[in-house]
Regions:
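Conserved catalytic or regulatory cores that recognize and/or transform ribose-phosphate-containing ligands
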Residues: 1-163
Length: 163
């Protein structure tokens, strides 16, 4: 079974979407439960206790090196994504580790936020970060696109069989 490092936003971007339930963090927890129910271990940074004198990047590295087999990015529309962008860039800087450990990358993204191919990661939302994220696509990012909650649940189910 897989060890999944599940990345993604924790909250909505209040400037673009009024606060609504469930928050992206809750949806990530639901995704985690779905994967766990199929026998996979899931790591969420928010749930792992901070360690004394460990900064955010050190925590990210420690968790990534924790027998992770797959990194899954959850990306809904209108979410606050800055920290998630940073995490994706951190993955690019860890290319050697990803290759050595054969860690696969997945993007569970809404159809309105990005188009992803092997050679391009094009952000469709405002605040375009495409030129930086194309390097992530070139790491072998596997896109899993969804349109609505039912479609998201189906993509999670299909993902759980691929892990």
């Amino acid at each position: 079974m897989a060890v999944v490092f599940l990345l993604g936003p924790g909250m909505w971007d209040k400037a673009r979407r009024p606060t609504a339930d469930p928050a992206p963090m809750q949806i990530r927890r639901n995704i985690a439960r779905g994967l766990q129910s199929r026998g996979h271990e899931v790591i969420l940074m928010e749930d792992d206790p901070d360690r004394p004198e460990e900064d955010y990047i050190q925590k990210f590295d420690r968790l990534l090196r924790c027998k992770v087999t797959d990194v899954v990015l959850y990306w809904p529309p209108l979410a606050k994504m800055q920290t998630t962008y940073d995490e994706l860039i951190l993955l690019c800087d860890r290319r050697a580790l990803l290759e050595k450990a054969s860690i696969r990358l997945w993007a569970l993204h809404h159809s309105t936020v990005a188009t992803i191919t092997r050679e391009e990661f094009k952000v469709l939302e405002s605040g375009n970060r495409s030129r930086y994220l194309t390097a992530v696509a070139r790491l072998g990012l596997r896109p899993l696109e969804w349109e609505d909650e039912e479609d998201l649940a189906e993509q999670v189910r299909l993902l759980s069989t691929e892990l």
